[in-house]
Swiss-Prot record:
Keywords: Cell membrane, Ion transport, Membrane, Transmembrane, Transmembrane helix, Transport. This is Molybdate-anion transporter. The gene is mfsd5. Signal peptide: none annotated. The keyword 4Fe-4S does not apply. It comes from Takifugu rubripes. Gene3D superfamilies: MFS general substrate transporter like domains. One of its GO terms (biological process) is monoatomic ion transport. Disulfide bonds: none annotated. Mediates high-affinity intracellular uptake of the rare oligo-element molybdenum. InterPro entries: MFS_trans_sf (IPR036259), MOT2/MFSD5 (IPR008509). The lineage of its organism: Eukaryota, Metazoa, Chordata, Craniata, Vertebrata.
Amino acid sequence: MFVTAYFAVISLLALCVGLELTARRLTPPESSAAVNPAFRRFQATFLRAYLLALWADWLQGPYLYKLYRHYSFLESQIAILYVCGLASCVLFAPFSGWLSQALGRRHMCIFFCLSYATCCLTKLSRDYFVLIVGRILGGLSTSLLTTTFESWYVHHHVEIHDFPKEWIPTTFTKAATWNHGLAVGAGLVANLLAEWLHLGPVAPFLLAVPFLACCAWFVLTDWAKEEAEKSPEGIKQTLPLGTLNGGVTHLSARARFSRSCSDGLRCMLSDKRVMLLGGVQALFESVLYIFIFLWTPVLDPHGSPLGIVFSCFMAASMVGSLLFRVATSTRYHLQPGHVLCVAVLMAFFSFFMLTFSTVPGQPRPHESFLAFLLLELACGLYFPALNFLQGRIIPEEKRASVLAWFRLPLHLLACLGLLALHGEVSGTGAGETGSGTRHMFGGCAVMMLAALMAVVSLFTLGRNDTDLKLEGSRGEGEMY
């Protein structure tokens, strides 16, 4: 597996370079946003902090499970740790947007840095309770990362700078491109620290702390300067909640939160397309959480360099994202709905393969590795296709609340899957006995079949629906 992983990462990165060059030739030129100096300065101010936060997040990916095994915890105990993180996401995600409005978006970004740094430092402890607290902080931090940074940017882009809304995807496209590269690089750096330098699986978590500190510094300085220059009334908007004006802000934010939740639920229940798309998202992404838990115990017993394997996964996802750009370009004009069907079908075949490659006593790690790469390739196709359809089907003003409702069954399904693993001894025949892992992959394959049926139902329902189709012009629903 050692040689296979290195060969795979080199091959995938070379493929990424070729696809990126092809995609650039087929993609229309940038809008006027690219040459607007004020916009570029504002974009750079945001990305400096945001990319540091993403980098710190990715550093923790390759060796989390390995760290818990290094501390001699059983797989069932590790499953509970993962469940605590997911449950924390379920509990805090609905309130993260409200807290950003009530306490201030910039303050919540600083709080993210503090909570995530504390989460990383808890990894130094072998105490199970301390690690549970760390996972709870990790779930809170993840929910903040996915909401507060983007919320700050969109608010300042539209309300403070009054830039055109059409320029927003320019920033998030650039962030997504960097995000893939950072993920690949994080796996390589984590592998360097943990295995090449023999610093152990805790080293990547400790390395993330100074990057989170740098992120907080940029938020404190650059973002504060941005707010001071562009929003002279900003001080009034961020009064402590104990003051009179702070209490008004708190009450209005709570009222907006309640109304947003009810509007999002009504939007889901009144539009069958939204319900079906939410079902696809809940099924597909809950399975991904189970994959995140299982890939290490499947591959690690066979001498796989986990950081390099993680980089392979991220490179495969990047290949999928680039293939989506090429497939939906003006030259090929493949519809995002068709790409979504292909992605779900690929994920099904991936888990179908894994049910045979993880037979207890007869593990086939190379086949499992190939199946995982196929799954990550499917993810690269899935996310931009889903973003496009969400942008077309879900009204913009209700999108955040609807997506929050989508995440609830998503995390609950993932928690149930991990709790099912907790209930039986799991293994792949490489040091552990039992067939829990194989059974879980079989369950994931069934869930992918259900997701495929939901996709087919969605496009049968909207066969002649222009909202589900990519038009010649790039509109509001275009993928980021």
